[in-house]
Amino acid sequence: MFPTLCVAYRAETNPYRLRFAACLVALTCCSALIANAATLCVNPRGTSGCKTTITAAVNEASPGDTVLIAPGIYKEDVIIKQSISLIGSNRATVIDASGLANGIFIDGMASAPKAGVSNVVVSGITVRNANFEGILAASASDVSLTGNLVIGNDKALDFSAGTCGDLDISFETNEQDDCGEGLHLMGVDHSTILRNEVAHNAGGILVSDETGPNGHNVISENFVHDNVYDCGITLASHGPAAVTGAHLSFGVGYNTISRNVSMGNGTKGAGAGVGIFAPGPGSTDTGNVVIDNEIIDNGSTGVAMHNHAAPPMAPPVNLNDNVIVGNHFSGNGPDNPGAPTSGPTGINIFSMAPITGTAISRNTFDKEAIDVGFSAPTGQLNVHFNDFSSGVAIDNMGAGTVDATENWWNCPQGPGGSHACATVTGSGVMTAPWLSSPFAPSSSR
């Protein structure tokens, strides 16, 4: 806020004096907001002047206020439409949304496709048993979700039928098969999802773009596990919601997925540990970074990148410039029939459009039949400084090329050099020179 106000005065006659004055005004305004911010409280009995429901406190709060919630079980669907902080008691604060749409809905939809709410904090709360998402944030900016337990939501899902009850498809355009997963950021930017546990929902964490552009979010240090019908963490470019009046996807991009554990997801529904999807014409999922995660024992591929819109279909698809670096892959499953691999796979990139700018580096693989699968009509995949296992390190299933130089092939002799060495299948894979020892010390794996 302060730099914007200062910059506005640069063209004035005395820029430094006016710029300083503008900053003083901004600081004064900000100080007034802080001084006027209130702290409200909630406890089950309503003692000490507290509310008995979270909703009552949220409705009474003003922008900048904090709502402190005592331990207890609160049976409600909390809707947040302004800048407030919702602080629980280290997960002993439980929102039980049985029979309700969501546990918490951060709702900026009135301004879609722009963000209609910002600066919302939700921390230390258990959210369970919602029909759809446990926590849904739509058309929002600068949201912080920290230290929450999101467990056992998506109750309306009929997995065998691929339907999700009365989910509002006017803005959730592609969630019938998972009810929106446990925690869903839709049209959200510059937000942080930190140190949450997301478990036993249909899917884990979903980042999508139905109601506006979705980007510059950080998803870090979360434990995402046993969400058995879908992926652990998903970045997906979907069709735009009708309420936006748009015809093309807004796009997902420049998100960081770091230092999470994604484990045991998709075991019944062929979900990946991490999914990056730009499935249809005009969809965009670009510039994302998947770094330093533990991705293990998921029902499908460790990281799946998919596009199913073949050129010359217009408008074009952008699934480029994503980076997968420093992760550990172990014991994941094969990719699904739409982008098949022949066995358990660490990373699979499947695209019917050209792929460029995607890099895979400093990853370690074990208990995978295929470490990296690649299928694209053109383009090049860059794969360097990885420690491969003893199976197929690179499976090139398309006409694109793979620069797989400077990797450790599980032996000093390089690909196929002995029975312990990793191998290559397919053509168009460059492997020499290679590393004569592992890139990552075994103690760091």
For every predicted segment, state its role.
Residues 337, 342, 385, 395-445:
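Functionally critical loop-and-helix segments that line ligand-binding/catalytic clefts
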Residues 62, 81-83, 90, 117, ...:
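Parallel beta-helix/beta-solenoid
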Residues 32-56, 60, 71, 92, ...:
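Right-handed parallel beta-helix/beta-solenoid
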Residues 97-112, 129-137, 159-187, 199-214, ...:
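Extracellular beta-strand/beta-solenoid scaffold signature
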Residues 21-32:
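Bacterial N-terminal signal peptides
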Residues 55, 59-63, 74-87, 94-143, ...:
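Extracellular beta-strand-rich solenoid/capping regions of secreted or surface-exposed proteins
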Residues 1-17:
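N-terminal secretory signal peptides that target proteins for export/translocation
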